[in-house]
């Protein structure tokens, strides 16, 4: 299972009380919903709890879904929060996942003044803005106000793991502490890749399981799409894409909603179509929102924040309702991924990924960050291998050169407007082979 701190936290200990509140209010909750026909996708074959629940029910095409009609003319976050409450959302726990892949260094070229999207300055960066807006909107629905917060895609996790923002995987107390931890840890990180959302989704499933089946919202903030190599066949998926799709399907067995917020320049075409490529799920548990498109509008800042919050959360009440109707709320599946978070990175000479997964040592608190300089130089073979691969996707070989002399793979290079290495404007692209 996950870290012991998760089980000992007030969130885990209060699962019974919170679940009783949700169920006891379900009758009044239902009255807030407008009814309309809908098509619910068939259950994933491995979703045994869902399958057994539906065994005596009508076929998916004949089921009815109760949608809340949430308008889109709100002027403040408070109005959006009130609308969510009126629509029936009673209880929600937030989990935050932050993309710290290397592409964050150049995907803010147009939308963030050519700065890294993780740049910490006097004004909030896109990640800080998204955390603040969603945190403020959902805080009234979170009884214990504890927020698990994780990073993925750095030099210790790549596309295989997540790291916690706190020692021993303790949770942040409110979104203000999430922002504080973010400001402290992000400047020390070695951004890397590739990008996969599977590890953070699996960690969220583990948290839901440990809580006894409380409803959670996983907020993933990312600067780019799941890594896709140019070698991937048309109509096929890269390993990272397939793992992410499988994780989203499996997550529909849990009372868990996934909101993916795209920050930076994109492109986001694949993520907009991602939902259509996901096979049958117990319920539609995935929502993508383009943060940059909304926040670049020429309207009042408060209106922009309200529009973003609404776009990100407007499906939450209906998804919460689905977990009630499917009997997912307050239940343990008995077969969660048992995803354990790594401790905050220190980038010691030995990668944390090579240390025992169950280790929760807090000794790193007394060790200074090495600012990217290892006391033991990496092997020449490793360096040479790294230099052969595209610095953007870290998967494909370099086969496209720019006017500045730097290289990427052709798949990534076609979408770039500035060089990811020197940030010069790209005016010439040369296919090497």
From Swiss-Prot:
Q: Which UniProt keywords apply?
A: Abscisic acid signaling pathway, Cell membrane, Lipoprotein, Membrane, Metal-binding, Myristate, Transferase, Ubl conjugation pathway, Zinc, Zinc-finger
Query: Which portions of the chain have biased composition (kind: Low complexity)?
Result: 22-39
Q: Where in the cell is it found?
A: Cell membrane
CDD domains membership: vWA_copine_like (cd01459)
For this protein, what reaction is catalysed?
Answer: S-ubiquitinyl-[E2 ubiquitin-conjugating enzyme]-L-cysteine + [acceptor protein]-L-lysine = [E2 ubiquitin-conjugating enzyme]-L-cysteine + N(6)-ubiquitinyl-[acceptor protein]-L-lysine
Q: Which Gene3D superfamilies match?
A: Zinc/RING finger domain, C3HC4 (zinc finger)
The answer to whether the entry has keyword Cytoplasm is: no
Q: What is this protein called?
A: E3 ubiquitin-protein ligase RGLG5
- Underlying gene: RGLG5
């Amino acid at each position: 299972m996950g870290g012991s701190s998760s089980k000992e936290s007030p969130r885990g200990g209060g699962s019974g009380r919170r679940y009783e509140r949700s169920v006891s209010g379900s009758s009044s909750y239902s009255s807030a919903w407008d009814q309309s026909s809908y098509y619910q996708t068939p259950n994933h074959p491995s979703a045994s709890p869902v399958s057994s629940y539906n065994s005596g029910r009508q076929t998916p095409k004949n089921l009815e879904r109760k949608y809340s009609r949430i308008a889109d003319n709100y002027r403040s976050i408070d109005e959006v929060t009130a609308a969510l409450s009126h629509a029936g959302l009673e209880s929600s726990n937030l989990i935050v996942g932050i993309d710290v892949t290397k592409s964050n260094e150049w995907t803010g070229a147009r939308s963030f003044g050519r700065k890294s999207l993780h740049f910490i300055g006097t004004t909030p960066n896109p990640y800080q803005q998204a955390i603040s807006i969603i945190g403020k909107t959902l805080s009234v629905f979170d009884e214990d106000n504890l927020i698990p917060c994780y990073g993925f895609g750095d030099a210790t996790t790549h596309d295989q793991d997540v790291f916690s923002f706190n020692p021993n995987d303790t949770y942040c107390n409110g979104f203000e502490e999430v922002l504080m931890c973010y400001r402290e840890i992000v400047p020390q990180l070695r951004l890397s890749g590739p990008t996969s959302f599977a590890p953070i989704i699996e960690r969220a499933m583990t948290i839901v399981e440990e809580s006894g089946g409380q409803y959670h919202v996983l907020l993933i903030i990312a600067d780019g799409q799941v890594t896709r190599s140019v070698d991937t066949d048309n109509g096929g998926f890269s390993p990272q894409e397939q793992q992410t799709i499988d994780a989203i399907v499996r997550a529909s067995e849990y009372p868990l909603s996934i909101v993916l917020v795209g920050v930076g320049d994109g492109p986001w075409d694949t993520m907009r179509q991602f939902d259509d490529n996901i096979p049958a799920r117990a319920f539609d548990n995935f929502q993508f929102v383009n943060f940059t498109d909304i926040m670049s509008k020429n309207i009042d800042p408060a209106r922009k924040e309200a529009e973003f919050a609404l776009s990100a959360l407007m499906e939450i009440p209906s998804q919460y309702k689905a977990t009630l109707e499917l009997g997912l709320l307050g239940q343990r599946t008995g077969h969660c991924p048992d995803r354990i978070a790594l401790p905050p990175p220190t980038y010691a000479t030995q990668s944390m990924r090579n240390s025992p997964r169950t280790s929760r040592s807090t000794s790193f608190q007394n060790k200074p960050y090495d600012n990217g300089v290892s006391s033991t130089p990496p092997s020449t073979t490793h360096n040479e291998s790294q230099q052969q691969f595209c610095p953007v996707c870290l998967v494909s070989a370099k086969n496209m050169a720019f006017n500045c002399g730097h290289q990427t793979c052709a798949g990534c290079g076609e979408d770039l407007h500035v060089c990811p290495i020197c940030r010069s404007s790209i005016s010439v692209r040369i296919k090497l082979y």
